[in-house]
Amino acid sequence: MASDTEWVLESVLGFVSGPVWTVPVLEFMEQKCSVFDDEEENKLSYTEIHNEYKELVETLLTQHLNEVGISEEQFQEACTAPLAHSATLKTILQPVLAVEDFKIFKAMMVQKNIELQLQAIRIIQERNGVLPDCLQHGRDIISDLEQQEMKLVSEALRLSKEEYEREQLRRSAKELNLTLGEHSENKQSSGSERTPNNTELPVKTQKEEKQPVNMLESPYKEVSIKLKEMSNTEAAEAWLEQARKEAGILSSVTNLSQAEKEQLQKRAEYLRRRREELLAKKQESKKMAQNSEEHEEKATCSKQEMTEEEKKSLQRRKRLAEKLKEEVILSCEKSGSAS
């Protein structure tokens, strides 16, 4: 039983490695893979293309199994055997397994789409020496935007932390002031003269502590007032918004994101056109190869026909030479008998 499974798998592996399988399957993938991307959402066109792929593979496999004499049950058993799910064989049998597994089919088509795009980019770069602008600068714009956003977020978090620390410092100073105020009132009721001097010290200390706080608060006065009533997350968002407004890049970021979308669309359209041209050239070269093969076959046939005609003419010449030889011999014999 195991030997039968190995024999069936060996036959299928040999078939999927040959041109009868690879040529139509690769041609189908190259023509249909342009609509596939790596997004999680599956489009309706994916299902239609998958059904077309099923029909193609089933037709090719059925022809091979009938020629070799393998039944459908034997083929199913071989595909479900543990040997078929090994890492090496699974990679080779991926186009066959993609008939029943849509995830494998989609991953295979996405990979082929990426390969064609990279191939088109290499051809463009080899032909022109450099890449067009629509393929060259789009990623730099995105990275610059990401760096600006990260700087703004870091700045907002830093300012939020400083504001939180200042708020804690103000609360501690306020509590200390209230405690000392109560203590001074108790001292005043007992008629102590040291209390005013003692109370002036923390008040003065509080003023001295407030001075650097006010200097730090001045660039972000409005946001600092609001942050007193906000949580840490809300404070970070407020600082981010304020930092964007003060840097004057809020509108530019929005514009750049739109420009980036247009740039990506141009890039995708450009690659699509180049890929279509590449596929058209492949089809044209394939037709030229087929035509040349047909011409060679016709030339070979004509040579064979000429050879047959030459053989016939040689046979006629031989017969004629034999007749002439016989006539010469007869004439010689007659002349000898006459003498």
UniProtKB/Swiss-Prot annotation:
Region (Disordered): 177-212, 281-318
Gene it is expressed from: cfap36
Keywords linked to the UniProt accession: Cell projection, Cilium, Coiled coil, Cytoplasm, Flagellum, Nucleus
Coiled coil regions, renumbered to chain: 142-188, 255-330
Family per record: Belongs to the CFAP36 family.
Name under which the protein is recorded: Cilia- and flagella-associated protein 36
InterPro entries the UniProt entry points to: BART_dom, BART_sf, CFAP36
Localization (cell): Nucleus; Cytoplasm; Cell projection, Cilium, Flagellum
Listed Gene3D superfamilies: ADP-ribosylation factor-like 2-binding protein, domain (1.20.1520.10)
Residue ranges with Polar residues bias: 187-200
Main localization of the protein described in the UniProt heading: nucleus
Bias type Basic and acidic residues, positions: 281-313
GO cellular component terms, A-Z: cytoplasm; motile cilium; nucleus
PANTHER family linked: CILIA- AND FLAGELLA-ASSOCIATED PROTEIN 36 (PTHR21532:SF0), PHOSPHODIESTERASE HL (PTHR21532)
Highest taxon of the lineage: Eukaryota
